[in-house]
A protein has these predicted regions:
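Metal-dependent amide/peptide-bond hydrolase catalytic core
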Residues: 1-141
């Protein structure tokens, strides 16, 4: 939220000062939509542990690049520790990095992957209920 506040202040200031320099006024209205989706680091570690234990090395990969997406789940992550995780569903023989995205009309999925998704959720829940998050977050253990 600090970054959003700063961006709003800077944009407002720039608009007002630019307008003032030209003998005008400016009014900036910002409508805030969804908050950013920010995973809890401790919960990401828990997910990695659960998926590696249950599906083996290579079943979990951290995305090194932040994404600008937003999601209803963001509201939950503001209140509770958690992690937004992508499930690989590209059809066999298709490079996941080249597959059409979730909101594309060209998206195809390997429906067998859905069972893995359900099993992954169960594995994460089992790991959390049996081991918690190692004391990293209030209310998470």
């Amino acid at each position: 939220e600090e970054a959003r506040d700063l961006a709003e202040r800077l944009i407002t200031n720039m608009a007002e000062k630019t307008a003032e320099a030209h003998g005008m006024t400016a009014e900036v209205k910002v409508t805030r939509g969804y908050p950013p989706t920010i995973n809890n680091g401790g919960f990401v570690d828990l997910v990695e542990t659960a998926l590696t234990k249950n599906f083996g090395q290579g079943a979990f990969a951290r995305d090194a690049h932040p994404r600008m997406g937003f999601e209803d789940f963001s509201f939950i992550l503001q209140r509770y520790p958690g992690a937004f995780v992508f499930l690989g569903t590209a059809p066999k023989g298709v490079n996941p990095l080249e597959a059409a995205g979730n909101h594309s009309p060209y998206m195809e999925i390997d429906e067998d992957a859905m069972a893995n998704g359900a099993a992954a959720h169960a594995a994460v829940a089992f790991e959390f209920l049996n081991h918690g998050m190692g004391g990293g977050v209030d209310g998470a253990d």
